[in-house]
Amino acid sequence: LLNTVLERKIQTRKRGLTFNVPTAVPISPQLRLLTYDESFISMQDIYERHCKQVGIGKDDPIIAWVEKMRSTWDGGSYRRTNVDFANLRMELLEEVSVKMISDKILTQFMTMSMSSPSDLWIMRKQFTLQMASTMFLTYILFISARYPGRIHISRSNGVVIMSDMVPTFSPQAPHFKSPDPTPFRLSPNIQHFIGPIGIEGLLASSFMALGTALTSSEHGLEDYLSIFVHDEVRFWFSGMQHQSKHLEPTIDLVKQNVCEVVKRARLMSCRYGQDKASITPVNQAVLDLINYASHPSKLALQDPTWMPWL
């Protein structure tokens, strides 16, 4: 449904921006068959290939992180604050990045996989556009836990698909809420492969094009999301039957969650920046989100299983 909207808008159509979801064939309530050709490879697989080549265990960075955290945090009688905790995590992230995991793993893999420099250039451009689509959905739909194993890249056409694309609810109530400190995954290896020009240029403009295309009509996005959000809220209620009678009516919860999603999509369109007569860039809201997603202080707050160094 959303792709039909993108096809009708000139800014998204000329960039080739689409949301890619693998075709699923339901076998049972717990089992689905997904389309997945041999050209796809996950970031986790790329990482494990690198670890095998350099002779380190795939869990060594996580083990080193946990052991250093435990030995430093538990040692001594000094009462540490949240600032000390954040500084320690930043030091650990820098140590793992410098000594164990380079930010060039994805770039080197893609360079070796392409047959010519022109193919690599096309792959980088297509990868940037596809990551813009996945990052956009991650942010507006409150999708969390974007582990490397859930990001799959096609080596033949640059298509990027995400598995487990499910909104995250607050534990206390059926309201969308992502616990991740970063709005989407823009880890060091993704940053290096896209490059600074691609991030500030193609990636940022794609965010704005997607947000503008989906929020240009009066109630278009709300109508598309209502059924989807309704199913998610009903699923939350089915798992909390003993508490559901004390909560608000489902119709109100659906409206609230839809409004939150639309609010984030409008933020990505940067319409507020266009209306103001200020000296700040029009896409300042998008640049702020990119900064939050790529800043080491935010990445360091992620769980080590999220692999903020990859």
Tell where the protein language model's regions lie, with residue ranges:
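Short, solvent-exposed loop/edge-beta patches enriched in aromatic
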Residues: 11, 143-145
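ATP-dependent kinase catalytic cores of phosphoinositide-metabolizing enzymes
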Residues: 1-133, 153-310
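Catalytic-loop signature of eukaryotic-like protein kinases
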Residues: 145, 149-152
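Extended amphipathic alpha-helical scaffold segments
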Residues: 138-142
